[in-house]
Amino acid sequence: MSLKKSPFFELRSGSVDTLLFIVKTADLDALRAELVKRFEATPEFFADDVVAIDVRRLADHERVPLDDIRGMLNDVRMRVIGVVAQPEQHAWAASAGLPLLEARDRRAPSSKAADEAPVQQAEPAAPAAGQAALFEQAGPTLADAGAPPESPAPAVAAQSATLVVDRPLHSGQQIYAKGDLVVLGPVSYGAEVIAEGNIHIYAPLRGRALAGVHGNHDARIFCTCLEPELISIAGIYRTTENPLPADVLGKSVQIRLEQEKLMIEPLRLT
């Protein structure tokens, strides 16, 4: 077989970042009701986004009809690209005809016992323990296509450089940072800033901010004027479906995770 490089196409190993729809119950009625509840107030948030169905939190004896779950997600305009499962779940998970993907999230999904553990009261955030399902940002890895890169990839630095954006972000614009992200202009409604590390916004945040998207639970969001459509850390998110308290709305804040809850706290700058 000739190893000559084709001018028309290449096959290479690669990975794709996507949302995980984490199934935590085999009760389809409860799952459907929770999904409708989440989307009826904010139907456009995940419209046309790709998603993988994650069944790793189901008990060993539990099975779910993946075709039905795919239909539910299609109904809210999400595009299912595959399934994430434990090795012992592969046989039945593959029966739906969806590709089996490997998630590269830093923290493995917690067990049901961990889901049911008591947590301290905090600002309402989605998802909370005990809910039927949640979305997380992760990196399912596509199957090896069989063609290696032309040359070895350089070693990745232990920490990615900070990305600084010194302009306003308008509706439809998206910024992604491999490390921390600093934004010096307003993030308008419909704009989105995403970082694997922390996010600092020295202007109004009116769009979406997603920090720690590969499962970094230590990531934080800092903002000088909080008026967001959505905030998220390590896949745990909150929308303005639940109005923000007066002491943080439009104020300087930091947002962090504490025991799987989003904590939104005023910043004392003086």
From Swiss-Prot:
Residues 105-129 are annotated as: Disordered. Residues 116-129 have a biased composition (Low complexity). GO terms for biological process: cell morphogenesis; division septum assembly; regulation of cell division; regulation of cell septum assembly. Keywords: Cell cycle, Cell division, Septation. It comes from the Bacteria. Pfam families: MinC_C (PF03775), MinC_N (PF05209). PANTHER family: SEPTUM SITE-DETERMINING PROTEIN MINC. Belongs to the MinC family. Interacts with MinD and FtsZ. Cell division inhibitor that blocks the formation of polar Z ring septums. Rapidly oscillates between the poles of the cell to destabilize FtsZ filaments that have formed before they mature into polar Z rings. Prevents FtsZ polymerization. This is Probable septum site-determining protein MinC. It comes from Burkholderia mallei (strain ATCC 23344).
